[in-house]
């Protein structure tokens, strides 16, 4: 084992992609981060996104997938969710940088006169701002500890116009911090052509040539393929791309994303990187990860959880929710299969019965807008009347309150989000959100965002799940429960408002005490779930779902 260096020097690892998008750069980077963490190194991660939006907060979920919210209230790329889950640590908003943020800051500096009359250009001003944000990740954490490694994923594909400033900034970073402190990983596609029965290396060769043409020579290549890349082909790629053969990594499609760290370790990527960067290390501690993989591949139980959503045509729109459901399964030594249910199909009792009659638990996640709302409310009604375990998230809580109010006799109960003129606004716009909703203020970045505390009622279902009375969860919403209706709803159907903000003004948790498990939260607990440490609300949901399944089978 090598000895720690006397002077701390942070190393920077850049992950780029070529040939095609959606190759799994984020999962590759996350898995490498998990491996290096398991070797005792302090790792942090960052995503550079080459789109002009300041953040993904106002982007269509069908295009971008979910928006991942950090503790400090940043709306970020879904890859940050992978980073947090694989590293088992919280990241800040600094971990996601967009072209929109960079240009906004540079233009603001120009208006303030900070460039002293310079002609502001992509090089050096834009690239300098990008480098500043990369190097910012080297700052000490809350415990005063600096990272050993910063892994930065550069979004997009090599050759894209919009990615060029980020790639140039990465190239310059190598010059600024020293070549011995930088490691470039290029993720590339090796397609299999069925008619000829061949794996083709030419796309990777062209992709690496494009990368080299802008001054970046990759230290390692991660070859994505639907099968293992044989050694002779790896040797050919190493020769043609001028990469050490031990730096050519085969990464075939895996049955579970949680197998990828094992795949990269088997190919010795972590050992190769550590040697090249002269990092101190220990052997990989696989105990926790092996325990996870046993639960992934050899669960004792199975159940089906319905996810009733508006954006199910793109599963990435609910990525953290589905991973939290699966993690809840792992915590119960069970395989939780997700059944995707379009919310529109659950509007009627017959439709809900058809879609939800064979499931063991139901989740209604967050979302925006009126489309599909009555179907979500129908799913809530089905869960309540058929005593199916249920968890509502953000909008799911609001739908649960609307359904409860209607069941309590407030037949016109609705939300001002869906019906601004409703006579029974059981869900209403938060006071500080009125300007954004009316169009007088910006929509982007103005919601109630980030971690907020809540106080739970002693003896409540949620307090039992959390095993504490004080919790903190991440939020992303503009609407809240109208307190004027709380008592009427409780008296009418027995719904309990079991958790609020510390001042008691904002409803954070609700539940039916006499239901096997029917809970909802205004927060997004899925963001804090980890594969090795499931979120308590999802663990409790799966536990109740397994009991429901066993009771149904008797």
From Swiss-Prot:
<dbReference type="GO" id="GO:0044210">
    <property type="term" value="P:'de novo' CTP biosynthetic process"/>
</dbReference>
<feature type="binding site">
    <location>
        <position position="478"/>
    </location>
    <ligand>
        <name>L-glutamine</name>
    </ligand>
</feature>
<protein>
    <recommendedName>
        <fullName>CTP synthase</fullName>
        <ecNumber>6.3.4.2</ecNumber>
    </recommendedName>
</protein>
<feature type="binding site">
    <location>
        <position position="236"/>
    </location>
    <ligand>
        <name>CTP</name>
    </ligand>
</feature>
<dbReference type="GO" id="GO:0005524">
    <property type="term" value="F:ATP binding"/>
</dbReference>
<comment type="function">
    <text>Catalyzes the ATP-dependent amination of UTP to CTP with either L-glutamine or ammonia as the source of nitrogen. Regulates intracellular CTP levels through interactions with the four ribonucleotide triphosphates.</text>
</comment>
<feature type="domain" description="Glutamine amidotransferase type-1">
    <location>
        <begin position="304"/>
        <end position="551"/>
    </location>
</feature>
<comment type="subunit">
    <text>Homotetramer.</text>
</comment>
<feature type="binding site">
    <location>
        <position position="367"/>
    </location>
    <ligand>
        <name>L-glutamine</name>
    </ligand>
</feature>
<keyword id="KW-0547">Nucleotide-binding</keyword>
<keyword id="KW-0067">ATP-binding</keyword>
<dbReference type="GO" id="GO:0003883">
    <property type="term" value="F:CTP synthase activity"/>
</dbReference>
<dbReference type="InterPro" id="IPR017926">
    <property type="entry name" value="GATASE"/>
</dbReference>
<keyword id="KW-0665">Pyrimidine biosynthesis</keyword>
<comment type="pathway">
    <text>Pyrimidine metabolism; CTP biosynthesis via de novo pathway; CTP from UDP: step 2/2.</text>
</comment>
<feature type="binding site">
    <location>
        <begin position="200"/>
        <end position="205"/>
    </location>
    <ligand>
        <name>UTP</name>
    </ligand>
</feature>
<dbReference type="Pfam" id="PF00117">
    <property type="entry name" value="GATase"/>
</dbReference>
<feature type="active site" description="Nucleophile; for glutamine hydrolysis">
    <location>
        <position position="394"/>
    </location>
</feature>
<feature type="binding site">
    <location>
        <position position="236"/>
    </location>
    <ligand>
        <name>UTP</name>
    </ligand>
</feature>
<keyword id="KW-0436">Ligase</keyword>
<feature type="binding site">
    <location>
        <position position="79"/>
    </location>
    <ligand>
        <name>Mg(2+)</name>
    </ligand>
</feature>
<feature type="region of interest" description="Amidoligase domain">
    <location>
        <begin position="1"/>
        <end position="279"/>
    </location>
</feature>
<comment type="similarity">
    <text>Belongs to the CTP synthase family.</text>
</comment>
<keyword id="KW-0315">Glutamine amidotransferase</keyword>
<dbReference type="InterPro" id="IPR033828">
    <property type="entry name" value="GATase1_CTP_Synthase"/>
</dbReference>
<dbReference type="InterPro" id="IPR017456">
    <property type="entry name" value="CTP_synthase_N"/>
</dbReference>
<dbReference type="InterPro" id="IPR029062">
    <property type="entry name" value="Class_I_gatase-like"/>
</dbReference>
<feature type="binding site">
    <location>
        <begin position="22"/>
        <end position="27"/>
    </location>
    <ligand>
        <name>ATP</name>
    </ligand>
</feature>
<feature type="active site">
    <location>
        <position position="526"/>
    </location>
</feature>
<feature type="binding site">
    <location>
        <begin position="200"/>
        <end position="205"/>
    </location>
    <ligand>
        <name>CTP</name>
    </ligand>
</feature>
<dbReference type="Pfam" id="PF06418">
    <property type="entry name" value="CTP_synth_N"/>
</dbReference>
<feature type="binding site">
    <location>
        <position position="79"/>
    </location>
    <ligand>
        <name>ATP</name>
    </ligand>
</feature>
<feature type="binding site">
    <location>
        <position position="153"/>
    </location>
    <ligand>
        <name>Mg(2+)</name>
    </ligand>
</feature>
<feature type="binding site">
    <location>
        <begin position="160"/>
        <end position="162"/>
    </location>
    <ligand>
        <name>CTP</name>
    </ligand>
</feature>
<dbReference type="InterPro" id="IPR027417">
    <property type="entry name" value="P-loop_NTPase"/>
</dbReference>
<feature type="binding site">
    <location>
        <position position="21"/>
    </location>
    <ligand>
        <name>CTP</name>
    </ligand>
</feature>
<dbReference type="GO" id="GO:0046872">
    <property type="term" value="F:metal ion binding"/>
</dbReference>
<dbReference type="GO" id="GO:0004359">
    <property type="term" value="F:glutaminase activity"/>
</dbReference>
<feature type="binding site">
    <location>
        <begin position="395"/>
        <end position="398"/>
    </location>
    <ligand>
        <name>L-glutamine</name>
    </ligand>
</feature>
<dbReference type="GO" id="GO:0042802">
    <property type="term" value="F:identical protein binding"/>
</dbReference>
<feature type="active site">
    <location>
        <position position="524"/>
    </location>
</feature>
<dbReference type="InterPro" id="IPR004468">
    <property type="entry name" value="CTP_synthase"/>
</dbReference>
